[in-house]
């Protein structure tokens, strides 16, 4: 029995014309997709997906499945939680870290001849670093009490203040002397006495002895001649001048003493205020030294 071959269905586009198969292939070549073009298109799709993933904001996932550190809360007990003091200069020197960024190898001064002023910023920087809190949730206890702010530096060279003349210091004293007392304390025809500026010498302020009057000598009337009366008038004028000068000096000293009493009370009040302020400063300094050590 002979096998019959079944005719295959042909695409009418591939049916060669009657005038030749070769000519039809040359005129209408068959275009098939190449393997390397498919691979190139797949690579481009992969790169596009990677670019999309890199541009999208994704949160990196950790491989650790336990609880994170920031989700925990530290147990804080005021009795057991204590801050220990650490010497920052020793810590930085052990780790080879310079105390301040200003101390580099390209410093214009040699290492042995550096000015003493360069040490001041480093100390202040270390003190500002020491005042920082050890934990972000616990603020530093001296953040409101420390007079030194972060980044604030003391002047390197402190100029010594010039001495003050005590005579130029004026204390506000509410003292207004009586004009009548000033008139009694001033010499007629001269400048008015000022108890604020007038100063007496040590000799003037010494106690004066009591002057006893001379014993009266009885002189009979027949001996009282013109020479006697002239001498008598002269002695009376001298005694009057002496009494007036002594009374004037006593009045001046009395007014001056009254002014000094008022000035003394004002100075005592000012000294009391200064001592109170000094006590507060000493307390703040003692608390600072207790936390951060002596300055």
Swiss-Prot record:
Compartment list: Nucleus
Compositionally biased residues, Basic and acidic residues: 37-52
Induction of its expression: Accumulates according to a robust circadian rhythm.
Family assignment from sequence similarity: Belongs to the bZIP family. PAR subfamily.
Subunit and partners: Binds DNA specifically as homodimer or heterodimer with other PAR factors.
An MF annotation (GO) of this entry: DNA-binding transcription factor activity, RNA polymerase II-specific
Record-linked InterPro entries: bZIP, bZIP_sf, PAR_bZIP
Region (Leucine-zipper): 248-255
BP GO terms, sorted: positive regulation of transcription by RNA polymerase II; regulation of transcription by RNA polymerase II; rhythmic process; skeletal muscle cell differentiation
Involvement in disorder: A chromosomal aberration involving HLF is a cause of pre-B-cell acute lymphoblastic leukemia (B-ALL). Translocation t(17;19)(q22;p13.3) with TCF3.
Expression across tissues: Highly expressed in liver; lower levels in lung and kidney.
Any one cellular-component term (Gene Ontology): RNA polymerase II transcription regulator complex
Biological source species: Homo sapiens
Keywords, comma-separated and alphabetical: Biological rhythms, Chromosomal rearrangement, DNA-binding, Nucleus, Proto-oncogene, Transcription, Transcription regulation
UniProt KW Transcription regulation keyword: yes
This protein's name: Hepatic leukemia factor
Location of region: Basic motif: 227-247
Tree of life domain: Eukaryota
Pfam families: bZIP_2 (PF07716)
Start and end residues of each stretch annotated as Disordered: 37-70, 93-167
Sequence ranges assigned to domain bZIP in this UniProt record: 225-288
């Amino acid at each position: 029995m002979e096998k019959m071959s079944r005719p295959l269905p042909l695409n009418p586009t591939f049916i060669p014309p009657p005038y030749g198969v070769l000519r039809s292939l040359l005129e209408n070549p068959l275009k098939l997709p190449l393997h390397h073009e498919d691979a190139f298109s797949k690579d481009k799709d992969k790169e596009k997906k990677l670019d999309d993933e890199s541009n999208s904001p994704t949160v990196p996932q950790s491989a650790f499945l336990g609880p994170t550190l920031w989700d925990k809360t530290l147990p804080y007990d005021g009795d057991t939680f204590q801050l220990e003091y650490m010497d920052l200069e020793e810590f930085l020197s052990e780790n080879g870290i310079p105390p301040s960024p200003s101390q580099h190898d390209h410093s214009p001064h040699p290492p042995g001849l550096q000015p003493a002023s360069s040490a001041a910023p480093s100390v202040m920087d270390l003190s500002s670093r020491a005042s920082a809190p050890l934990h972000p949730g616990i603020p530093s206890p001296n953040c409101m009490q420390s007079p030194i702010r972060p980044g604030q530096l003391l002047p390197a060279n402190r100029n010594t203040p010039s001495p003050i003349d005590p005579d130029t210091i004026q204390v506000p004293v509410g003292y207004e002397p009586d004009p009548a007392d000033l008139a009694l304390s001033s010499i007629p025809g001269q400048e008015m006495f000022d108890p604020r500026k007038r100063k007496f010498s040590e000799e003037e302020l010494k106690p004066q002895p009591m002057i006893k009057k001379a014993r009266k000598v009885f002189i009979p009337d027949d001996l009282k001649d013109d020479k006697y009366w002239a001498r008598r008038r002269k002695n009376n004028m001298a005694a009057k001048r002496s009494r007036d000068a002594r009374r004037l000096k006593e009045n001046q000293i009395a007014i001056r003493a009254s002014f000094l009493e008022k000035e003394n009370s004002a100075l005592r009040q000012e000294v009391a205020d200064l001592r109170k302020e000094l006590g507060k400063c000493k307390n703040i300094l003692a608390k600072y030294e207790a936390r951060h050590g002596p300055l």
